[in-house]
């Protein structure tokens, strides 16, 4: 399985993903600092906003990966060339989905830590709000974001269903935007962005869709 994942890494160029990750992190950090300064938002809410933004960005990035590694290959029929290899179809699809889930989890985890540390340093240097952020608080917030990262990795697979059903990249991307809109919404009365149970439900749906796809890949030539 790891050999197949390594093959995918060699076959596709992920340079765009790395560059996009760096740019996204810088933009998120550049966005949250002035928001807190101008709106006088409490630190608790800022960490929630930070985590929600990071998860939203990389769930959409996950949809782009789904489009490049799976949807495009079905749409252009190039995936059927891989099915001529002496390797089970299930293993090929599993490797692709594992790669997408692992990349999404890793990038959300690293981004959460980097953006949180960046925010911590800037906040304490320039005192952009009356709140103080001790190092212990920073660690607690990062650990909390890592729990959401696991759930987001599963949720990032939900667009697979819509993309394969239509064999459409736009459907894949639009469904990912809809998903992040739902699971990261927040208002003064009720917030889904910091509700781990909602995120876990979305993750369960994503994992179920992945298993369904793997199970049915041998039965038909197009899912």
Task: Please identify what each model-predicted range represents.
Residues 62-66, 79, 155-162, 209-213:
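Hydrophobic/aromatic residues in alpha-helical transmembrane segments
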Residues 23-24, 195-223:
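Alpha-helical transmembrane segments of multi-pass membrane transporters/translocases
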Residues 11, 34-73, 194-202, 223:
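Membrane-embedded or membrane-proximal helical elements that form or frame transporter/channel pores
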Residues 1-21:
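Aromatic- and glycine-rich beta-strand/loop motifs that create alpha-glucan
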Residues 16-18, 88-89, 93-94, 168-173, ...:
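Membrane-helix interface segments
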Residues 21-28, 170-183, 199-202:
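Central hydrophobic cores of alpha-helical transmembrane segments
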Residues 69-101:
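Helix-loop-helix units of permease transmembrane domains in multi-pass membrane transporters
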Residues 30-59, 98-160:
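Secretory targeting signals
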């Amino acid at each position: 399985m790891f050999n197949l994942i390594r093959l995918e890494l060699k076959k596709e160029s992920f340079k765009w993903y790395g560059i996009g990750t760096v740019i996204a992190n810088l933009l998120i950090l550049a966005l949250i600092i002035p928001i807190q300064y101008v709106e006088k938002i409490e630190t608790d809410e800022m960490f929630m906003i930070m985590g929600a933004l990071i998860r939203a960005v990389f769930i959409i990035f996950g949809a782009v990966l789904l489009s490049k590694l799976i949807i495009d290959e079905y749409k252009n029929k190039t995936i059927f060339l891989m099915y001529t290899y002496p390797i089970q179809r299930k293993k090929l699809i599993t490797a692709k989905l594992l790669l997408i889930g692992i990349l999404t989890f890793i990038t959300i985890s690293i981004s959460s830590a980097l953006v949180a540390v960046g925010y911590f340093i800037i906040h304490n240097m320039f005192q952009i709000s009356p709140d103080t952020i001790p190092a212990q608080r920073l660690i607690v917030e990062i650990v909390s974001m890592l729990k959401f990262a696991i759930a987001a990795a599963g949720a990032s697979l939900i667009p697979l269903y819509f993309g394969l059903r239509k064999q459409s990249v736009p459907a894949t991307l639009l469904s990912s935007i809809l998903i992040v809109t739902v699971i990261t919404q927040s208002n003064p009365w009720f917030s889904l962005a910091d509700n781990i149970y909602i995120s876990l439900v979305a993750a369960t749906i994503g994992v179920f869709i992945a298993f369904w796809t793997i199970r049915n890949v041998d039965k038909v030539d197009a899912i």
